[in-house]
């Protein structure tokens, strides 16, 4: 997951001709008509959260932020992980519309039983004290639209979030 953050930082340092620090997002997860009822997606566990609310004074990346959330599933193969998408719902702290994708995202497998969802934005409004504190819910969803159990995610620029294994 750290390599994803490094890759984004490197992209932002390239000249405008090489990259304009484009906003990146996990691909959209597409539903399919089910021939039979899909099972409820397995429960996910948050393993890591990389959160950068806004890049610094770089020419091409000023104000661009991103988040990458690594999820783990017990007993789910990489192939079956592709049949699970994720809605992200803000619970608190998200002050700007359009900061969180409104569509379900497909996770990118990162290791056996683990997958990552990520997205970026341009411009974010912090809390009055200057910090950003997001509380989110990640809701797994099957190809036929059956929703699973939501999992809580906390991302903040201060120490207000528990460690990922405490979520």
Predicted ranges, named:
Residues 146-158:
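Extracellular fibronectin type III
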Residues 123-132:
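Surface-exposed, short loops/turns at beta-strand junctions within beta-sandwich domains
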Residues 97-113, 154:
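Solvent-exposed serine/threonine-rich low-complexity stretches and specific carbohydrate-binding patches
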Residues 20-70, 159-167:
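Short, compositionally biased P/S/T/A/G/V-rich stretches that sit at domain boundaries
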Residues 74-100:
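Solvent-exposed loop/turn segments flanking beta-strands in beta-repeat/beta-sandwich domains
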Residues 111-122:
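Aromatic sugar-binding surface patches on proteins
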């Amino acid at each position: 997951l750290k390599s994803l953050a490094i890759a984004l930082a490197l992209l932002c340092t390239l000249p405008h001709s090489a990259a304009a620090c484009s906003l990146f997002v996990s691909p959209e997860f597409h539903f399919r008509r089910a021939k039979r009822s899909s099972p409820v997606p397995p429960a996910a566990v948050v393993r890591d959260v990389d959160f950068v609310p806004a890049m610094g004074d770089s020419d091409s990346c000023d104000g661009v932020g991103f988040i990458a959330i690594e999820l783990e599933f017990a007993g789910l193969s990489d192939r079956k992980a592709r049949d699970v998408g994720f809605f992200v719902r803000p619970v608190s702290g998200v002050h700007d519309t359009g900061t969180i994708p409104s569509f379900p995202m497909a996770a990118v497998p990162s290791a056996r039983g683990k997958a990552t969802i990520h997205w970026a934005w341009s411009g974010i409004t912090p809390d009055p004290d200057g910090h950003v504190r997001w509380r989110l819910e990640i809701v797994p969803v099957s190809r036929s639209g059956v929703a699973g159990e939501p999992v809580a995610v906390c991302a903040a620029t201060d120490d207000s979030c528990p460690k990922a294994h405490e979520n």
